[in-house]
Regions:
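Helix-terminus loop motifs that line ligand-binding clefts
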Residues: 9, 24, 61-84
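Alpha-helical repeat scaffolds
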Residues: 62-66, 100-112, 141-146, 185-196, ...
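Alpha-helical scaffold segments in carbohydrate-active enzymes
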Residues: 17-18, 68, 72, 91, ...
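Low-complexity, Ser/Thr/Pro/Gly-enriched N-terminal "stalk/linker" regions
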Residues: 1-38, 45-51, 56-57, 63
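Short coil/turn connectors between adjacent alpha-helices in alpha-solenoid helical repeat scaffolds
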Residues: 51-58, 93-101, 131-139, 177-184, ...
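Solvent-exposed loop and edge beta-strand segments that line ligand/cofactor-binding
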Residues: 4, 29-43, 71-83, 110-120, ...
Length: 258
């Protein structure tokens, strides 16, 4: 995807101030609702989707969701799951897709410092800190977590949801794994998917999405059954209702790119 110049982004931002939101005529787009109170999880999923905008309408939608995200981050920086949202916004800025205020990088640093939740969820944030600030300590911490994830992902005794997250991190960040073996990672993916269908596990949309992203990375290098991937996409689509915006975003992304 071609990166817009600063001038082009500036023109689009000025147009966004004077033009109304796009008409809601395309069923495959998730248009912003100014009356809705979006959660950090929902906005992060929407930014992940529209960061790959395909047309001008989707770019306008992206800008609207970024505005919502910035307001939420500024007003409620300590909400659960805020670290991921801040990371999505900061990464869009790093890629030159949007302009972001300078305080976002400080917000990212603060969020990573105070986040005491699941270390797996910090990996992308830590790697982004390394990219934008050349923070070698963040890179080392991320590498340690990624290698721990790789080991946990290959252990059948690891709790299923945690194993899915660990496999996703290990595969999508495999350059940081000391001895990454794509065949063994593929075996872990197939074992997980077989267990899900054999035992009728009810996975949350984000776990299904993580499995699909991992499969997309692995498929060109090791056997990943296409029927298993399609079953997961179908499950994800079933969760996508107007009341579950994050699931809708995940499902749309999977249909387009996975």
């Amino acid at each position: 995807m071609q990166t817009l110049s600063e001038f082009e982004i500036s023109v689009l931002e000025n147009l966004a101030l004077i033009l109304p939101l796009p008409e809601r005529v395309d069923d495959d787009k998730i248009f912003p609702d100014p009356t809705r109170k979006y959660s950090p999880e929902e906005l992060a999923a929407l930014l992940h989707l529209y960061g790959k905008y395909r047309d001008m309408t989707e770019l306008e939608i992206l800008h609207e969701y970024v505005d919502y995200a910035l307001d939420l981050i500024k007003d409620s920086p300590r909400l659960p799951a805020m670290t991921r949202l801040i990371t999505e916004v900061a990464d869009l800025g790093r890629k030159g897709i949007i302009h972001i205020p300078a305080w976002i990088h400080k917000a990212l640093q603060d969020a990573v410092t105070r986040d005491t939740g699941n270390p797996t969820e910090l990996v992308e944030s830590l790697l982004l800190l390394y990219l934008v600030n050349n923070d070698k300590a963040a890179q080392r911490k991320a590498k340690h977590i990624i290698n721990s994830c790789y080991r946990a992902a290959r252990e059948s005794e690891t709790e299923l949801n945690g194993r899915i997250d660990c496999l996703h991190i290990a595969v999508t960040c495999c350059d940081y794994v000391s001895r990454f073996n794509v065949r063994k990672a593929g075996e872990a993916w197939n074992e997980i998917s077989h267990r899900i269908f054999a035992e009728s596990y009810n996975l949350s949309p984000d776990k299904i999405f993580n499995l699909l992203e991992a499969a997309n990375e692995l498929a060109g290098y090791t056997p990943i059954p296409s029927d298993a991937r399609q079953k997961l996409k179908n499950r994800l689509k079933e969760t996508a209702t107007p009341h579950s915006i994050a699931a809708c975003a995940y499902s749309r992304y999977a249909a387009l790119y996975l």
